[in-house]
């Protein structure tokens, strides 16, 4: 299970998805619905962008959940949570999440994948900021996502 807000999905996310999809028979890429977070895109829009961006990976299942990651993993019968890391800041946060998940369910493992160097600076927030200032994010997000971002920001 690979969870995230994916608002929007970036090429950094896709790097992790592609690599994790080679490691497991099925990879659930799950949009975590956080009622305390304001998103640019609706859940439906994010699902649509993820489906389009991952259509080349036949073993990737796109889903949504408001459950905790370990609860969702239990629901779908998964034993591994995949997390992507860009830098030490990600590690600090993700290690705390890993320990929390171990506390909640010691039978579900967390696997950390370092993103490729080209994507170490890429985040959904960063991408939205760039587009809001009318700059291109080509190479940072799939083309279908860039189109949706431009529609949102430039009307």
Language-model region placement:
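Nucleotidyltransferase catalytic core that binds NTPs
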Residues: 1-155
